């Protein structure tokens, strides 16, 4: 049984992270609390592993959460049939940062919390620009160039689109791209895209691949890319 959801779990003031109450357990966490690190890019650009969720909460306080899928998973165990909920969650600040995660538990609430935590640990920085040569607006509204991502049987290709086109992709892709701060894109998708975990994974992989493409500073500037 699978249930898709676009329910937003935006943080409200009552759940706002209080850095003063945080006791970091890692050197990276201590640098964040002490103010030595003030920008998430100082971590992501160096490929440093995020081992404490509070690092993300402190540096990206405007992060939003979207539950995309709640799936009931059954498996046989020697003690009988075991039932778990598997939840897929995306997080993002709608301005260049997005994460994807899944969580499993016998109850929906704990599964959602696990998925949110996993998405924060998987947070990435997304390259954006104006990659459609017919547009030339110079704003960061689309992907800077054509890129492909894969997950299991699903392949998702994202193509730059002019401003105003919107997100020409399935709802799962729309959720991830909008959380990443991308407003316009063409797409070509194949495989079992009705499987949320694979479709979401393919789109997320495409966004990760954007940063692995080597381009000259001149070309990136022409595409309006800001790393």
Swiss-Prot record:
Residues 1-22 are annotated as: Disordered. Residues 63-126 form the S5 DRBM domain. It comes from the Archaea. InterPro entries: Ribosomal_Su5_D2-typ_SF, Ribosomal_uS5, Ribosomal_uS5_arc, Ribosomal_uS5_C, Ribosomal_uS5_euk/arc, Ribosomal_uS5_N, Ribosomal_uS5_N_CS, Ribsml_uS5_D2-typ_fold_subgr. GO terms for molecular function: rRNA binding; structural constituent of ribosome. Part of the 30S ribosomal subunit. Contacts protein S4. This is Small ribosomal subunit protein uS5. It comes from Methanosphaera stadtmanae (strain ATCC 43021 / DSM 3091 / JCM 11832 / MCB-3). The gene is rps5.
């Amino acid at each position: 049984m699978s249930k898709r959801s676009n329910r937003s779990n935006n943080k409200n003031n009552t759940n706002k992270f209080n850095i003063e109450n945080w006791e970091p357990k890692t050197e990276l966490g201590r640098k964040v609390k002490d103010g030595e690190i003030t920008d998430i890019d100082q971590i992501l650009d160096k490929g440093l592993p995020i081992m404490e969720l509070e690092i993300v909460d402190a540096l990206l306080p405007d992060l939003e959460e979207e539950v995309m899928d709640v799936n009931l998973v059954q498996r046989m165990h020697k003690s009988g049939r075991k039932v778990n909920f598997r939840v897929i969650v995306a997080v993002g600040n709608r301005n260049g940062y997005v994460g994807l995660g899944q969580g499993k538990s016998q109850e929906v609430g704990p599964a959602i919390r696990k998925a949110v935590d996993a998405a924060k640990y998987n947070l990435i920085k997304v390259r954006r620009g104006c990659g459609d040569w017919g547009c030339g607006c110079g704003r960061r509204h689309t992907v800077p160039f054509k890129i492909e991502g894969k997950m299991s049987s699903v392949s998702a290709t994202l193509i730059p689109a002019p401003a105003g086109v919107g997100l020409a992709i399935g709802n799962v892709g729309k959720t991830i791209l909008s959380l990443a701060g991308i407003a316009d894109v063409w797409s070509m998708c194949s495989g079992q895209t009705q499987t949320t975990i694979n479709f979401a994974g393919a789109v997320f992989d495409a966004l990760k691949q954007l940063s692995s493409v080597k381009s000259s500073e001149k070309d990136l500037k022409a595409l309006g890319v800001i790393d």
